Swiss-Prot record:
Lineage: Bacteria, Pseudomonadati, Pseudomonadota, Gammaproteobacteria, Enterobacterales
Entry's induction text: Induced by maltose and the transcriptional regulator MalT. Permanently repressed by cold shock in a PNPase-dependent fashion.
Descriptive protein name: Maltose/maltodextrin-binding periplasmic protein
Keywords assigned: Periplasm, Signal, Sugar transport, Transport
Entry's localization field: Periplasm
Family statement: Belongs to the bacterial solute-binding protein 1 family.
Biological process, per Gene Ontology: carbohydrate transport; cell chemotaxis; detection of maltose stimulus; DNA damage response; maltodextrin transmembrane transport; maltose transport
């Protein structure tokens, strides 16, 4: 079903409160490209890249942003339908690949060398490349320049800094303690890890959740709470509000938080996360990726579009102008974007971080580590007990 772009946008807004029926989406068919990307990304910019592709090749490109596309894709792709190209965070792609829904991609070495090597690791599943890395997200330390012109380089400096700021009615640091995505950089700094990654594969029995490094990181976090430098019940909205009102000097968050801080008029900077025991904090790294549907009859066209139109300075610039991508996988365009110190810091933290594993076992990891951190932070369990239980849950 072909719908003109303007009409489609109207149709989409009318359907926001309804489930997007499969019939409302363009069908997979030879000789045209259908792309799905989430509604919070620069889909209008991506459509501009599609127009250039159509002008050069005569191949029509339709960009759609269906609701819950990450759940819809496996349903429709399993029946041989859906988009030719799907954009989503890389960690869902392992499950798709396991179900046989993604085509293996074969970019040549010259093309692979245009992108940062660690981004290719994010889209490798059982040793095979299953998507193209596009953009990179990681947590950074965000600080209020008026309260704290020089942010601390180490976690160990934070207790003394908090005492100084408390004397002025402020606090040093508030961030989301309820979700392990935010607490993991500290837990992983001295040697914690989710699943061991070797030779392009994850060993699901080699889990680093209760090793000495993970225990040291979580113990430090618990001590910050015990010593009243942080509150165990701090969640995302509490931490965001405190930082954006100028009540706390620092928070830990990602590029998605910048627009709200801009609106709040806080004079802020984004920098590298503090070290712990001399080791860099290791945030989980998410990579916005583009996979090709195994059922697509247009795999070569999809490859041409992604390699020679989207993953170019001009292509990524069109998407970025619509909605900021953050840091990007393409070295040449990242060098341009990194003139913004916020983006340079995001990439630096990502390069020091841990690629979020793209395996189904991560759901057990999130559940177990969330419980462990909350129990240790509240004093319901010791750090050793909490992490031992988490390790057992993940590996059982």
């Amino acid at each position: 079903m072909k719908i003109k772009t303007g009409a489609r946008i109207l149709a989409l807004s009318a359907l926001t409160t309804m489930m997007f029926s499969a019939s409302a989406l363009a069908k997979i068919e030879e000789g045209k490209l259908v792309i799905w990307i989430n509604g919070d990304k620069g889909y209008n910019g991506l459509a501009e890249v599609g127009k250039k592709f159509e002008k050069d090749t005569g191949i029509k490109v339709t960009v759609e942003h269906p609701d819950k596309l990450e759940e819809k894709f496996p349903q429709v792709a399993a029946t041989g339908d859906g988009p030719d190209i799907i954009f989503w965070a890389h960690d869902r792609f392992g499950g798709y690949a396991q179900s046989g829904l993604l085509a293996e991609i074969t970019p040549d070495k010259a093309f692979q060398d245009k992108l940062y090597p660690f981004t290719w690791d994010a889209v490798r599943y059982n040793g095979k490349l299953i998507a193209y890395p596009i953009a990179v997200e990681a947590l950074s330390l965000i600080y209020n320049k008026d309260l704290l012109p020089n942010p601390p380089k180490t976690w160990e400096e934070i207790p003394a800094l908090d005492k100084e700021l408390k004397a002025k009615g402020k606090s040093a640091l508030m961030f989301n303690l309820q979700e392990p995505y935010f607490t993991w950089p500290l837990i992983a700094a001295d040697g914690g890890y989710a699943f061991k990654y070797e030779n392009g594969k994850y060993d699901i029995k080699d889990v680093g959740v209760d090793n000495a490094g993970a225990k040291a990181g979580l113990t430090f976090l618990v001590d910050l709470i015990k010593n009243k430098h942080m509150n165990a019940d701090t969640d995302y909205s509490i931490a965001e509000a405190a930082f954006n009102k100028g009540e706390t000097a620092m928070t830990i968050n990602g590029p998605w938080a910048w627009s709200n801080i801009d609106t709040s008029k806080v004079n802020y900077g984004v920098t590298v996360l503090p070290t712990f025991k001399g080791q860099p904090s290791k945030p989980f790294v998410g990579v916005l990726s583009a996979g090709i549907n195994a059922a697509s009859p247009n795999k070569e066209l999809a490859k041409e579009f992604l390699e020679n139109y989207l993953l170019t300075d001009e292509g990524l610039e069109a998407v970025n102008k619509d909605k900021p991508l953050g840091a990007v996988a393409l070295k040449s365009y990242e060098e341009e974007l990194a003139k913004d110190p916020r983006i340079a810091a995001t990439m630096e933290n990502a390069q020091k971080g841990e690629i979020m594993p793209n395996i189904p076992q991560m759901s057990a990891f999130w559940y177990a580590v969330r419980t462990a951190v909350i129990n240790a932070a509240s004093g319901r369990q010791t750090v050793d007990e909490a992490l031992k239980d988490a390790q057992t849950r993940i590996t059982k």
